[in-house]
Curated annotation (Swiss-Prot):
Leader sequence residues: 1-27
The keyword Secreted is assigned to this record: yes
Coiled-coil segments on the chain, per record: none
Top-level taxon: Eukaryota
Pfam families per record: Hydrophobin
InterPro entries named among the record's database cross-references: Hydrophobin
One GO CC term, this protein: fungal-type cell wall
Function: Aerial growth, conidiation, and dispersal of filamentous fungi in the environment rely upon a capability of their secreting small amphipathic proteins called hydrophobins (HPBs) with low sequence identity. Class I can self-assemble into an outermost layer of rodlet bundles on aerial cell surfaces, conferring cellular hydrophobicity that supports fungal growth, development and dispersal; whereas Class II form highly ordered films at water-air interfaces through intermolecular interactions but contribute nothing to the rodlet structure.
This protein's UniProt keywords: Cell wall, Disulfide bond, Secreted, Signal
Entry annotated with the keyword Nuclease: no
Name of the protein described by the UniProt record: Class I hydrophobin Po.HYD
Gene responsible for this protein: Po.HYD
Main location: secreted
Length: 110
């Protein structure tokens, strides 16, 4: 025969497992993802990786080991069903300068 404590804990654990998750304030909106490396990014500026980049506050910088395009200036993931990208949508495979510059980018048509 079960003790009262065992019955109590069994009931509480079953009740807890059936409750809805508590909202945390974070939204889990799906991102538009046409890339193998992460979400499609909407960036203010893109240019050839072989050209020096003028980053405000840093001056001209050169990106090493990058092919294709580099993207910089307020890059953010696109959200499905959300706002459209008014600048350039890109798919990138890495970052440099502590995330200020996305490297190895290709244009994405939406």
């Amino acid at each position: 025969m079960f003790s009262k404590a065992t019955l109590f804990f069994t009931t509480v654990s079953r009740y807890r497992d059936t409750q809805a998750p508590i909202p945390t304030g974070q939204t889990n909106q799906p991102t538009t993802n046409q890339c193998n490396t992460g979400p499609v990014q909407c960036c203010d500026t893109t240019q050839s990786a072989s050209d020096p980049i003028n980053i405000p506050g840093m001056g001209l910088v050169h990106v090493s080991n990058a092919n294709g395009l580099v993207a910089f200036g307020n890059c953010s993931p696109l959200v499905s069903g959300g706002s459209k990208c008014n600048n350039q949508a890109v798919c990138c495979n890495g970052t440099e300068f502590n995330g200020l510059v996305n490297v190895g980018c290709t244009n994405v048509s939406l």
